[in-house]
Amino acid sequence: MKVIGIVGMPASGKGEASRIARDLGIPVVVMGDAIRERVKEAGLPPTDANFGAIAGKLRADLGMDAIARITIPRIEATGAPVALVDGIRGDYEVATFRDHFPDFTLIGIDSSFTTRYRRLKNRGRSDDSLTPEELRARDERELGWGLGRALEQADCRVTNEASLEEFAAEIRALLCRLGGREE
């Protein structure tokens, strides 16, 4: 099974890359879904603070790769020859995926703080940071989980600063090449 991982800072374009993968017929497993489920089970409101607290507790209790280990059966359950995993947050998760899936490729998505903040203001998800300070705090939390080190391990990098159309074309071409699909 070929597994393509996506890593990037909040609002860098991971969700858009996942949407494009789905459009190409590549199943997508979102690591954050495991966190969202646990927040809901705990009866907590779906806020960035609650998602961060639950994710931090899982990592503290079960290890820094806990969410990757929870996600592996979901990836395998797709039964597809190629799947994409969205939302890698740390180098321990990358190591776990590389160990478990010999054919694993990591795509890093880069986007500036200013661009990411503008996107957050426009997309309106419940876990989105609303102020620059909240985004900086979220960035620091995720960097503390090893997100920067995970980005450094990317097999390929895509910069997402231009138009949505340009980013989509670059991601589509990359996913087609990696997934053995025609563009």
UniProtKB/Swiss-Prot annotation:
Domain of life: Archaea
Keywords assigned: ATP-binding, Nucleotide-binding
InterPro entries xref list: NTP_hydrolase-rel, P-loop_NTPase
Any GO molecular function: ATP binding
Binding site residues for ATP: 8-15
UniProt record similarity statement: Belongs to the UPF0200 family.
Protein name: UPF0200 protein Memar_1556
Species this protein is from: Methanoculleus marisnigri (strain ATCC 35101 / DSM 1498 / JR1)
